[in-house]
C-alpha cells in the first residue's frame, strides 16, 4: 500500500482466491483496521470463518455464480483447480469495459478458466515453476508431486502454452504471477513466455 501511496481506508473490497496461508496472512489484522468488504466463494468464506480470520464487523459477500458491482467495477468469480475447496480466480470489468483477469494457484487450465479469462485486456496468469528446477530442487518429494499435480500450480511451460490463444483473442498485456522463489526465476518465466509467442 505504501508503494501505491494508498491507505487502508481507500480499499473498498478484498477478493480472496483461497484459504492457504500465503494468501490470507495478515487478512484479519487488515480487516480489523478497515471497512473493506470481503469477497470469496462460500467454501473459502467457511474456511476463513473456521480459522477465525474474519472480524465480526466485516461485511461479507459470497461470490459464487453471480456478478458483484463495486463502484462500477463488475467482479466475477471462476473456479480454479487447486488443493482446497472453493479456489477461485476473478475477472474485473471496468466502467470502460476493459477486462482484467487474475488467475493464480491452479494446477491445470480448465475450459472454465479459459472461457472466463478469454478476451481480457490484461491477464495475470500463474507461471509458478520451471519443471526441471522443481524436480532438482530442495522440496521434499510429496510437495513436488503436489505442485506438479492437477491441483497444484501452473508451470512456465503450461502458462506459456496458453498465452498465444489469449493474445489471438484480444489480450494485450500479461503479468506472469506467483513465481516460486525456489523453483523459478523471472528470467526463466519471461523467456519461456516470450518463446511461445514467436
Feature map (PLM): residue ranges:
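Helix N-cap/coil-helix junction residues
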Residues: 6, 53-54, 168
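Active-site neighborhood of phospho(di)ester-bond hydrolases with catalytic His/Asp-centered motifs
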Residues: 11-19, 39-42, 101-104, 124-126, ...
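Cap/insert and terminal regions of metallo-dependent hydrolase folds
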Residues: 111-198
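Active-site metal-binding motif and surrounding structural segment of the metallo-beta-lactamase
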Residues: 1-40
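Hydrophobic packing residues within well-ordered alpha-helices of enzyme cores
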Residues: 1, 27-30, 48, 113, ...
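Glycine/small-residue-rich loop that forms an oxyanion/phosphate-binding "nest" at active or ligand-binding sites
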Residues: 24-86
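Core dinuclear metal-dependent hydrolase active-site scaffold
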Residues: 1-6, 25, 63-122
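Active-site environment of divalent metal-dependent phosphoester hydrolases
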Residues: 20-24, 45-47, 84-85, 108-111, ...
Amino acid at each position: 500500500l505504501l508503494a501505491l501511496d494508498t491507505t487502508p481506508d481507500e480499499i473498498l473490497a478484498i477478493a480472496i482466491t483461497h484459504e492457504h496461508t500465503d494468501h490470507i496472512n495478515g487478512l484479519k489484522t487488515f480487516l480489523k483496521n478497515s471497512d473493506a468488504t470481503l469477497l470469496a466463494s462460500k467454501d473459502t468464506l467457511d474456511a476463513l470463518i473456521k480459522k477465525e480470520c474474519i472480524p465480526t464487523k466485516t461485511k461479507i459477500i459470497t461470490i459464487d455464480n453471480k456478478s458483484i458491482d463495486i463502484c462500477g467495477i463488475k467482479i466475477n468469480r471462476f473456479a480454479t483447480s487447486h488443493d482446497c475447496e472453493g479456489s477461485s480466480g476473478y475477472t474485473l470489468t471496468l466502467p470502460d469495459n476493459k477486462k482484467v483477469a487474475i488467475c493464480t494457484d491452479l494446477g491445470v487450465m480448465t475450459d472454465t478458466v479459459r472461457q472466463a479469462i478469454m478476451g481480457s485486456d490484461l491477464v495475470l496468469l500463474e507461471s509458478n515453476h520451471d519443471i526441471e528446477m522443481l524436480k532438482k530442487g530442495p522440496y521434499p518429494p510429496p510437495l513436488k508431486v503436489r505442485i506438479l499435480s492437477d491441483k497444484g500450480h501452473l508451470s512456465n511451460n503450461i502458462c506459456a502454452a496458453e498465452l498465444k490463444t489469449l493474445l489471438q483473442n484480444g489480450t494485450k498485456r500479461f503479468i506472469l504471477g506467483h513465481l516460486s522463489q525456489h523453483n523459478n526465476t523471472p528470467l526463466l518465466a519471461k523467456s519461456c513466455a516470450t518463446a511461445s509467442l514467436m
